[in-house]
C-alpha cells in the first residue's frame, strides 16, 4: 500500500499559498547491490516559500502513520548493515551508500513548506525502491556544481556536464523555481547523447528576483541502461540587489550632509547609513560577502524606511579635524536583504 498526503494552510494572514510542485514522479525506483543510489523529488514552491525535507514513517491504511510497527528503514535491515541511508534536509536528495541485499523497499519523504519561519503546509510522498543484484549498469554522474551569486541585471550563464561510464545514452534535465517564474524565468538548453550530456543554464535576473533566500536548482541525469539509473546534483543561486550609487558628502560646521541616488530597483524598502573614523578599504567581493559594511569595520548610524528618503545629516559625536568615511546601502525584502554599499566608500571627510 502506498499513500500520498498533502496539507496546505489557507489563511488571510498568510496571503496566497500554492501547493508544492514536483518534477520527478515517485515511480518505482531501481537500485543496484553495492552501488550508490540517489533520488530527488525535484520539488519547488511556486510562491518562493522555503522547503525542508525529512524521512518519516510511511503511511498505511487510512493514511495513518506506520510508526511503532514492523517498518524498518532500508539501512537498518540486518543484511544491509554497514550501509548508510539518509536525506539532505535542504535539497531533498536521498542517498543510500550502498545497498547490500536485493529486495523491495519503501521510504517516505516529508516535504515541509515554510514562510517567515512558520510551517504553512507539507506533502508526504512514498517511494518504492527495488534493489537488484542483476545490475551490469553503473550510474551516471554529474560534475559537481558550485553555488552561484549574481547581481541584478547581470546574466548568469554556465554549462553543467554529465557523463556515463558505460557510454549509455544520457538525458539531462533541470528543476526549480527560477524556471517557473512569471517574469524573466531561467532557461536550460540541453544536449543529450551517448556517454555524455550537458545543459546550459541562462538567467537574466531582474529587480523582482531579489529575495533573502537563495534559489535552489536541481539537476537530474538519467541513462538508458538496464536498469535505468540516475544522478542528482543541487546548487543555490543568490540574487543580489544593485549597488547603490551617487553618494555625495559635505562638511558643514561639525556636521556632515549626505545625499545619494535612489536605486533603479524601486522595490527597495529603505536605506542604511554607515560611518567609520578613518579610511575603509573595500577588498571583499560584495556578492559573496553580504553585509560588507560591517566587514569593513563600519558602524550603522541611521536607517530609513522610505524609498524617497535620500538625505541624511550626521551630527552625532563628530570630532573637529577627524576624518570620517561613509557608505549607504539599500534594503530589500522587508529589510532582510542589503545591497552592496555606495561606490564612494573611500571618501574621507575633514570636520
Located regions from the model:
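Extracellular acidic, Ser/Thr/Pro-rich low-complexity tracts
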Residues: 42-49, 160-168, 207, 221-223, ...
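Strand-loop-strand motifs at the edges of beta-sheets in extracellular beta-sandwich domains
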Residues: 74-99, 184-206
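Beta-strand-rich modules
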Residues: 314-335
Amino acid at each position: 500500500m502506498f499513500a500520498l498526503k498533502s496539507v496546505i494552510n489557507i489563511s488571510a494572514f498568510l496571503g496566497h499559498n500554492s501547493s508544492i510542485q514536483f518534477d520527478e514522479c515517485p515511480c518505482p525506483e531501481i537500485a543496484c547491490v553495492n552501488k550508490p543510489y540517489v533520488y530527488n523529488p525535484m520539488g519547488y514552491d511556486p510562491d518562493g516559500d522555503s522547503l525542508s525535507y525529512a524521512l518519516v514513517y510511511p503511511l498505511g491504511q487510512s493514511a495513518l502513520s506506520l510508526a511503532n510497527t514492523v517498518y524498518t528503514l532500508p539501512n537498518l535491515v540486518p543484511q544491509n548493515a554497514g550501509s548508510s541511508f539518509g536525506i539532505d534536509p535542504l535539497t531533498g536528495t536521498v542517498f543510500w551508500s550502498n545497498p547490500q541485499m536485493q529486495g523491495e523497499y519503501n521510504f517516505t519523504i516529508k516535504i515541509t513548506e515554510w514562510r517567515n519561519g512558520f510551517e504553512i503546509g507539507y506533502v508526504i510522498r512514498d517511494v518504492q525502491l527495488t534493489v537488484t543484484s542483476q545490475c551490469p549498469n553503473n550510474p551516471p554522474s554529474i560534475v559537481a556544481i558550485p553555488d552561484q551569486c549574481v547581481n541584478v541585471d547581470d546574466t548568469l550563464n554556465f554549462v553543467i556536464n554529465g557523463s556515463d561510464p558505460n557510454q549509455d545514452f544520457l538525458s539531462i534535465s533541470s528543476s526549480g523555481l527560477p524556471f517557473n517564474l512569471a517574469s524573466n524565468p531561467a532557461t536550460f538548453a540541453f544536449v543529450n547523447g551517448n556517454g555524455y550530456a550537458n545543459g546550459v543554464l541562462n538567467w537574466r535576473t531582474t529587480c523582482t528576483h531579489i529575495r533573502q533566500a537563495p534559489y535552489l536548482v536541481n539537476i537530474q541525469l538519467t541513462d538508458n541502461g538496464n536498469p535505468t539509473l540516475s544522478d542528482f546534483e543541487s546548487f543555490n543561486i543568490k540574487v543580489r540587489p544593485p549597488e547603490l550609487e551617487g553618494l555625495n558628502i559635505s562638511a558643514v560646521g561639525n556636521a556632515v550632509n549626505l545625499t545619494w541616488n535612489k536605486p533603479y530597483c524601486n522595490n527597495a524598502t529603505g536605506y542604511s547609513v554607515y560611518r567609520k573614523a578613518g579610511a575603509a578599504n573595500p577588498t571583499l567581493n560584495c556578492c559573496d560577502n553580504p553585509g560588507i559594511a560591517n566587514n569593513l569595520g563600519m558602524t550603522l548610524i541611521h536607517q530609513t524606511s522610505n524609498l524617497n528618503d535620500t538625505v541624511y545629516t550626521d551630527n552625532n559625536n563628530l570630532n573637529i579635524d577627524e576624518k570620517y568615511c561613509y557608505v549607504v546601502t539599500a534594503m530589500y525584502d522587508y529589510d532582510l536583504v542589503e545591497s552592496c554599499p555606495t561606490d564612494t566608500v573611500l571618501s574621507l571627510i575633514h570636520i
